[in-house]
């Protein structure tokens, strides 16, 4: 080994140093990453002898770089610190710089295998490749994204935060004087007291003016007419009784004074007959409302069973027909003039023939109206029409909904 090294050294003294080829530019260098060469970890004795001989040679340019190699040997940790402070370059610049350094280092080698590059550049390359430590993936991603250790939340901290959400506040909340209310897509400050007053007024107005439906209106009108019908029943009964009493008083005993009846009653005949007809119509309709005429068989069965409401409706209807049958007689009484007057409708001796059936019909009407009023007063709240028209409709809807669900 020594002989070979000596011979090579003599040849090195005899031969002049070779001229270095030109360094290629950055555009000529391909961007592909060169394969990493395994760094030499151990120095062989031959390399040590070559380094010693290289130091003795005066023509080598490496004499000026001896202090850097000495400093590297004395302070091996210096390149590591310099590498840690060095910022990381982008991928393209890093590949280009590494390719430059690798190409320049390969070109600066002579035939003897000794690097002609300054020792300082080798020192910079060597720790960058050798002292590169592999970091875990999580820490590497965290460093690239700029995440600090304080920003990382562990499982224990999350459990503590979840527990703190459900804890009751220790302090006592106090009401604030101003409240922000949204008006026309903007929040405006308002006093709490005024807001409470306005809400109270709104509640009162809602209580006073509830929303009505058509069913509620129909039910209210029906009940109001039933009250009017009850009043008409009593008033009709009183008017009919008063009418028959006045007729018998004016006619005298055994209808002996019919001329007096005609003279006194002619002013009352037409107005009273109209009032009687109106009251009879209202009472008859009110009595019919209390019967379920949608089911005629049920109405007939109630009449045959002497139901008070069915009997009252039948009696009112009969009284109305009888009253209408005597309408012409009432008109004739209203136009009464003595027989001695020319153009009179009443001849002598026919008063009793005309008035006697009229008095009997009025007596029957009074009896029928009185009996009907008694029957209805026995059960004044009974109203089958209300139960069938309103209550049954409410019950029919759920049945229809059930049928629809069953069919679906």
Swiss-Prot record:
Subunit structure: Part of the tectonic-like complex (also named B9 complex). Interacts with TMEM107.
Top-rank taxon: Eukaryota
Protein family membership: Belongs to the TMEM237 family.
GO CC term, one of those recorded: cilium
Coiled coil, from the record: none
Membrane topology qualifier: Multi-pass membrane protein
Locations listed in the record: Membrane; Cell projection, Cilium
Biological process, per Gene Ontology: cilium assembly; regulation of Wnt signaling pathway
Involvement in disorder: Joubert syndrome 14: An autosomal recessive disorder characterized by severe intellectual disability, hypotonia, breathing abnormalities in infancy, and dysmorphic facial features. Neuroradiologically, it is characterized by cerebellar vermian hypoplasia/aplasia, thickened and reoriented superior cerebellar peduncles, and an abnormally large interpeduncular fossa, giving the appearance of a molar tooth on transaxial slices (molar tooth sign). Additional variable features include renal disease, abnormal eye movements, and postaxial polydactyly.
Biased composition (Basic and acidic residues): 1-14, 60-77
Transmembrane segments: 227-247, 268-288, 303-323, 358-378
UniProt signal peptide: none
Protein name stated in the entry: Transmembrane protein 237
Protein role: Component of the transition zone in primary cilia. Required for ciliogenesis.
Entry keyword set: Cell projection, Ciliopathy, Cilium, Cilium biogenesis/degradation, Joubert syndrome, Membrane, Phosphoprotein, Transmembrane, Transmembrane helix
Annotated spans, Disordered: 1-137
InterPro entries per UniProt: TMEM237 (IPR029409)
Composition skew (Low complexity), residue ranges: 95-106
Residues recorded as bearing Phosphoserine in the entry: 25, 49
